[in-house]
């Protein structure tokens, strides 16, 4: 059954694709295929080709009908989007004309109870975008109290992180925590909320999801890969949904759109020329009509940039984010 809904318009989809300015003969990457919304919008320009990536096998299977409709203009690849440079190389594509990324969990994943992403449904505590690797239940069962607290604080920006971690460790001594309802109830006993507040478990669920899928590392690597495979004038458009994602995108584009690396005190150090030119200094946000139709659009921010002729910046040093493998070893 296809999950690529022809009626699906992704959050800020028309605005993001307008930033790409697709043209006849151009090749584009939809780095987060999902329900296929961005891909459809790009393919609406005759003569375009799209390489669409998703690590979720359900999304890839759901795109089969769209592949047929595209008459050879669409290639679907099941993979992490951090590997987009290698994916393009495997398709004999050295450079692409534009890349769109819609970062984070998809509506399709959130709304499927069996995937375990949401506290709105009682389901298995999974949260994996792919079918491999440790699940959120594995993390809850094995991580140390200190690591749990750090993950919930850093990835969830949750000020009650230590109390939540302490409650999780106490609860798992009594019984296995394997469902979303169990975890949400544990968190709700620690985080008190008033009417109108977000659900007490919102930040904890976000933190576990980010860790399980290594989302922020993935984003940083994907942005660096995009810088390498976009030619001069190639476009990058990124839609993010929470402050950590947006901070990474904003910082990346800010650093690469200004002259840097030199010093008036050490003039012999060569300055790094800007590798991107910003397309918007302030993020594009959804208008009232879109947020009414889709409340998830309220937090969305779109940032874009065009590649310059300057060489790509050297890769950043290793990430400082908590790593899934380290957390799983620490329990």
Curated annotation (Swiss-Prot):
Function, as annotated: Specifically methylates the N4 position of cytidine in position 1402 (C1402) of 16S rRNA.
Subcellular locations according to the entry: Cytoplasm
Reactions catalysed, as given in the entry: cytidine(1402) in 16S rRNA + S-adenosyl-L-methionine = N(4)-methylcytidine(1402) in 16S rRNA + S-adenosyl-L-homocysteine + H(+)
Record's keyword terms, sorted: Cytoplasm, Methyltransferase, rRNA processing, S-adenosyl-L-methionine, Transferase
PANTHER family in the cross-refs: 12S RRNA N4-METHYLCYTIDINE METHYLTRANSFERASE, S-ADENOSYL-METHYLTRANSFERASE MRAW
Protein name, entry field: Ribosomal RNA small subunit methyltransferase H
Entry-linked Pfam families: Methyltransf_5
Amino-acid positions noted as binding S-adenosyl-L-methionine in the UniProt annotation, renumbered to this chain: 36-38, 54, 81, 102, 109
Gene Ontology MF: a single term: rRNA (cytosine-N4-)-methyltransferase activity
Cellular component terms per the entry's GO annotation: cytoplasm
InterPro entries for the chain: RsmH (IPR002903), SAM-dep_MeTrfase_MraW_recog (IPR023397), SAM-dependent_MTases_sf (IPR029063)
SUPFAM superfamilies membership: Putative methyltransferase TM0872, insert domain, S-adenosyl-L-methionine-dependent methyltransferases
Any single GO BP term: rRNA base methylation
Record-stated family: Belongs to the methyltransferase superfamily. RsmH family.
Low complexity biased stretches: 305-323
Keyword Transcription belongs to the record: no
EC number: 2.1.1.199
Region spans: Disordered: 298-331
Predominant location: cytoplasm
